[in-house]
């Protein structure tokens, strides 16, 4: 179930990314203003992908908790890790046509651990939510992973150009 949720979560995430890339001035690949591009990176891959991965894992955990025995803590964190791995695999398949085998290998070495670790953090947030019955861990862990994902994407897309963003500020 977790793997299927991870694969399916790529659909709304890809749609959201496409809307940001095609319908706004936040197209981080083509915008002449690097600040708008960085904002686009944080909104689309950062906030968008992390939201859909967390929602997919949370849906599975919620369904499992209602239908059978409660999901154990290790199962929750590992289940979310599976969501991240499945998401990364589908994302890499979609990206394959853009760069060839070397690019796919590099994405496999970087994107899979990134998505897996971000989803494991989602799993910890969901555990804290279920344990304490307070929503703040969901928000804190979601925003933390979105920030980390956004920072990684900014560094990988813009590289040394990132200095241009912070110097004027």
Where are the regions a protein language model picked out?
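Hydrophobic alpha-helical segments at protein termini of multi-pass membrane proteins
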Residues: 1-169
């Amino acid at each position: 179930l977790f793997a299927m949720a991870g694969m399916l979560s790529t659909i709304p995430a890809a749609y959201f990314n496409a809307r940001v890339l095609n319908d706004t001035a936040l197209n981080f690949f083509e915008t002449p203003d690097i600040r708008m591009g960085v904002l686009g990176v944080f909104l689309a891959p950062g906030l968008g992908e992390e939201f859909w991965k967390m929602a997919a894992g949370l849906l599975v955990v919620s369904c499992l908790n209602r239908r059978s025995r409660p999901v154990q803590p290790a199962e929750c964190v590992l289940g979310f890790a599976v969501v991240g791995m499945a998401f990364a695999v589908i994302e890499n398949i979609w990206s394959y046509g853009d760069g060839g085998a070397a690019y796919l290998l590099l994405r496999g070495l970087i994107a899979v651990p990134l998505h897996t670790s971000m989803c494991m953090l989602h799993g910890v947030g969901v555990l804290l939510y279920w344990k304490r019955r307070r929503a703040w861990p969901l928000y804190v862990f979601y925003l933390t992973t979105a920030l980390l994902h956004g920072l990684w994407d900014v560094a990988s897309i813009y590289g040394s150009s990132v200095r241009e963003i912070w110097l004027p500020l």
